[in-house]
Amino acid sequence: MIPVVALVGRPNVGKSTLFNRLTRTRDALVADFPGLTRDRKYGRAFLSGYEFIVVDTGGIDGTEEGIETHMAEQSLAAIEEADVVLFLTDARAGLTAADQAICEHLRRREKTTFVVANKVDGIDADSACAEFWALGLGEVYQMAAAQGRGVTNMIEYALAPYAEALGLNRDGDEDEDEEEREYSEEEAEAEQKRLQDLPIKMAIIGKPNVGKSTLTNRILGEERVVVYDSPGTTRDSIYIPMERDGREYVMIDTAGVRRRSKVHETVEKFSVIKTLKAVEDCNVVLLIIDAREGIAEQDLGLLGFALNAGRALVIAVNKWDGIDQDIKDRVKSELDRRLGFIDFARIHFISALHGTGVGHLFESVQEAYDSATRRVSTSMLTRIMQMAQDDHQPPLVNGRRVKLKYAHAGGYNPPIVVVHGNQVKKLPDSYKRFMMNYYRRSLKVMGTPIQIRFQDSANPFEGMNTKKLTVSQERRRKRMMTHIKDKK
């Protein structure tokens, strides 16, 4: 399960700056996900081989009343969900009463906490950070989030003790090399067999009261999950193993994600974290949309998170029974207009309550998983690359034509194609999209996003120790050149 890192601290200590750097966004507001409280932001981060969810819990004012209300209502539940807590302080401002009050709450939670002294640029960092040792939470780590100094080392140190338990790769470079290396036929076949033998993890996500638990019960044929006509019945993600048509599955019924203004209870506010972790943990996402309400911003937010995670996708429009034909036409038109960018995903119109169309969902889930784990040979990928070049030549870069040499599989679930060549990293985004769509059409990939990575081929002579000619060698070279000229 992907770990959660919570950023805790008083206002203006640099939490949003660190959040933006970890999530590689320019504005923390772009990660202000529907369903979270106003002061909480989340994002998906990948740094130095570690993949994790980072949560900014918002500033805490430090007053007794503020600590009791803000910490209890917004931050304590987030800290409970977190695997690691980064307690940010301001090295320039020094230790304050607010820092000490927050420290007391963190100590009572008995969570793994790292004290981070931010804004150490331009000052005597060791002297400025000395007083933070009085907090009694262990070593004080120095960081300048705005410049990125110390960020990578901090994350590596914070997550390294849990790397094995959380299934993380300690060395990011090794992970990248493994991901982009060319599989041999035996290795590719073994990897595909391993994936095919594993149960398919299918996460059912969507807004509250769209019928996720009803669909789960319909599939299982039993009242396994509590169903009630009220949003927020499911508070946690429920993992349910099952078998269908000789294939093993693990269904994940997740809590719904609502608009922030409609989220009042603390326990519900943070159930969204479990939903996001379930998306990271699954193989196929089944997004449920309410036909009566149409596509909401929460649906698009969940859809974006699933795509960013590279998960295979199936969409089910629920409550399709009992609505007028003109409403059905309007919903289909809206789906075409707003979901045109995911034309690879199958869309089903179902009634979870009555079972209409539910049986066909598994056909699309199986198809999406097969596409995500399908093995394609290097020769086939290279041949498709050559066909794409013939149809549309790469553009000129610095007066030279970009040359694509060969392609190979770089990974599964989602399928990754690595294209090697000269100056390929300088290709414009438009040509990269052309290549991605060309591979999708040629391979007939359905139900899963496909990733195209471009790798510049290494110069075989780069770094070679070219020795300077000796005096005798230089004279001999001149005699040979003179002899060649005389012959002409």
Curated annotation (Swiss-Prot):
This is GTPase Der. PROSITE patterns: G_ENGA. GTPase that plays an essential role in the late steps of ribosome biogenesis. Residues 168-191 are annotated as: Disordered. Belongs to the TRAFAC class TrmE-Era-EngA-EngB-Septin-like GTPase superfamily. EngA (Der) GTPase family. Associates with the 50S ribosomal subunit. GO terms for molecular function: GTP binding; ribosome binding. The keyword Cell inner membrane does not apply. It comes from Shewanella sediminis (strain HAW-EB3). Residues 172-189 have a biased composition (Acidic residues). Residues 374-458 form the KH-like domain. GO terms for biological process: ribosome biogenesis. Residues 3-166, 200-373 form the EngA-type G domain. HAMAP family: GTPase_Der. CDD domains: EngA1, EngA2. GTP 2 binds at residues 206-213, 253-257, 318-321. GTP 1 binds at residues 9-16, 56-60, 118-121. Keywords: GTP-binding, Nucleotide-binding, Repeat, Ribosome biogenesis. NCBIfam families: GTPase_EngA, small_GTP.
